[in-house]
Amino acid sequence: MAASSLSVILIILGSVLLILTTIPVKNTIEDNTLTVNYIIGKKKIDITGAVFMPVPDEARHNLVRVAGTSIGKINSGNFKNYKTGTIFKLYLCGKGEQVYFEVGETKYLIDNLIRK
């Protein structure tokens, strides 16, 4: 009985830790690198050659999340446009208003605070 309770606790704890590694809290840009800071951990993304423009509106319609996390205005994950078949890797933090995503081989970075 105690062993099964411990197993359940470890599974729940592991699941919570895994979820916390997918929730972005702050994005920073420095030396052609976008750093996506998660609650636990961070990911550095090379943005050399990124296109500093928003993706056309029609590409953002019909998006369905295939993996990722959403809590309030914080979103992160992989999205697929089922009409065009385009897959987006989206890192969005509503706090910083920065969006980084990849469409195929093209990298997009939008910073609404700087490029309005």
Model feature map: region roles:
Residues 37-104:
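Non-transmembrane, membrane-adjacent beta-strand/coil modules in membrane-associated proteins
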Residues 26, 44-46, 107-109:
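Well-ordered beta-strand positions in beta-sheet-rich domains
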Residues 24-35:
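Alpha-helical transmembrane signal-anchor/signal-peptide segments
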Residues 1-26:
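Alpha-helical transmembrane spans
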Residues 5-12, 50, 86, 116:
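Generic low-polarity alpha-helical segments
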Residues 1, 39-42, 114:
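Short, structured coil/loop segments at alpha-helix boundaries
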Residues 102-116:
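C-terminal/domain-terminus segments
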